[in-house]
């Protein structure tokens, strides 16, 4: 790789700057939550911004000004509707370019350039980005199915800022994946005779990890949904119960751990070396760790008999 290309590939482009900023924000928030109770800032607005669902309803007194910005947590499905549509469109554009030689729409190519997508991406394999975009779309489709048919949402809330962030998040993730495609002008650039010639061992490993992580996340969501249903599958209440089974035996929020592993599987599919995607993974790590920590606190405060050996997010560690 030419020195100028290597420098461009390693530069802090706008896309990396966004993910680095989000990572720093979630890390700082997590560190603040880990402070001893007496040192933790008591700002109600701050706590309202970072909590959602059961961890929000556990707050003793929420000002009316905070409640004015509540959005039902069941609106989580909107995130995945947007993701399925948007990332499905991006996948269609990439498929057209890879297999039919059709150029990206000019507005999309311009947007990718603004975000920092570089020509040729330093030898990045087009197959890697294609597989990751497929994984992202399948993940979003499964999560949409779970929101509609598996999960049982109570009347708990999320902040409107969290809702807006969720809507933008999967749009940004999809653009991040597409920006890793090696480009020749407005067309995807394929090194070698065809796309399948780019197949590597890490593509197989990444696919296996994705399937494994997705299966565990689905199982954990089924366990959570069944806590509110009878044996016939009918919802009988919306109370919280202690979940057992699968990864719940090790951590309080295995669905968050599985989410992290899904993104790690995509990093593996990129061949381990994609710095931009590792910034995405790091953001997911601190984001999910924060949510898991708050959920762990909720469970321990609500249930006296909560298993002492369970960690919040990482088995045996945290």
Curated annotation (Swiss-Prot):
The keyword Thylakoid does not apply. Expressed in preadipocytes (at protein level). Overexpressed in hormone-refractory prostate cancers (HRPC). Almost no or little expression in normal adult organs. Plays a key role in early steps of protein N-linked glycosylation by being involved in the conversion of polyprenol into dolichol. Acts as a polyprenal reductase that mediates the reduction of polyprenal into dolichal in a NADP-dependent mechanism. Dolichols are required for the synthesis of dolichol-linked monosaccharides and the oligosaccharide precursor used for N-glycosylation. Also able to convert testosterone (T) into 5-alpha-dihydrotestosterone (DHT). Its main location: endoplasmic reticulum. One of its GO terms (biological process) is dolichol-linked oligosaccharide biosynthetic process. Residues 35-80, 139-157, 216-260 are lumenal. It is a multi-pass membrane protein. GO terms for molecular function: 3-oxo-5-alpha-steroid 4-dehydrogenase (NADP+) activity; 3-oxo-5-alpha-steroid 4-dehydrogenase activity; oxidoreductase activity, acting on the CH-CH group of donors, NAD or NADP as acceptor; polyprenal reductase activity; polyprenol reductase activity. Gene3D superfamilies: 1.20.120.1630. It is found in: Endoplasmic reticulum membrane. Keywords: Cataract, Congenital disorder of glycosylation, Disease variant, Endoplasmic reticulum, Intellectual disability, Lipid metabolism, Membrane, NADP, Oxidoreductase, Transmembrane, Transmembrane helix. It catalyses: a di-trans,poly-cis-dolichal + NADP(+) = a di-trans,poly-cis-polyprenal + NADPH + H(+); a 3-oxo-5alpha-steroid + NADP(+) = a 3-oxo-Delta(4)-steroid + NADPH + H(+); androst-4-ene-3,17-dione + NADPH + H(+) = 5alpha-androstan-3,17-dione + NADP(+); 17beta-hydroxy-5alpha-androstan-3-one + NADP(+) = testosterone + NADPH + H(+). Changing residue 307 to R: In CDG1Q; uncertain significance. Its EC number is 1.3.1.94, 1.3.1.22. Pathway: Protein modification; protein glycosylation. This is Polyprenal reductase.
């Amino acid at each position: 790789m030419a020195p100028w290309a290597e420098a461009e590939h390693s530069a802090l482009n706008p896309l990396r700057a966004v993910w680095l900023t989000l990572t720093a924000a979630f890390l700082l928030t997590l560190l603040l939550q880990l402070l001893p109770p007496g040192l933790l800032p008591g700002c109600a607005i701050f706590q309202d911004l970072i909590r959602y669902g059961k961890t929000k309803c556990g707050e003793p007194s929420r000002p009316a000004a905070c409640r004015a910005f509540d959005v039902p947590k069941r609106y989580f499905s909107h995130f995945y509707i947007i993701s399925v549509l948007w990332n499905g469109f991006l996948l269609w554009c990439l498929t057209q370019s890879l297999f039919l030689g059709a150029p990206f729409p000019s507005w999309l190519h311009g947007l990718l350039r603004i975000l920092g997508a570089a020509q040729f991406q330093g030898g990045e394999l087009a197959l890697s980005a294609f597989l990751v975009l497929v994984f992202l779309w399948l993940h979003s489709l499964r999560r949409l199915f779970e929101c509609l048919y598996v999960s049982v949402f109570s009347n708990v809330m999320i902040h409107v800022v969290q809702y807006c962030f969720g809507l933008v998040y999967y749009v940004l993730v999809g653009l991040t994946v597409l920006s890793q495609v090696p480009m020749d002008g407005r067309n995807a650039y394929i090194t070698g005779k065809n796309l399948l010639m780019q197949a590597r061992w890490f593509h197989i490993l990444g696919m296996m990890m994705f399937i494994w992580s997705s299966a565990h996340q689905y199982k954990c969501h089924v366990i959570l949904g069944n806590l509110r249903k009878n044996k016939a599958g009918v919802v009988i209440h919306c109370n919280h119960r202690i979940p057992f089974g699968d990864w719940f035996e090790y951590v309080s929020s295995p669905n968050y751990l599985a989410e992290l592993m899904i993104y790690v599987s995509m990093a593996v599919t990129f061949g381990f070396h994609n710095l931009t995607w590792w910034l995405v993974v790091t953001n997911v790590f601190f984001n999910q760790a924060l949510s898991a920590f708050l959920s762990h606190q909720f469970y321990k405060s609500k249930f006296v008999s909560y298993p002492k050996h369970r960690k919040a997010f990482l088995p045996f560690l945290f």
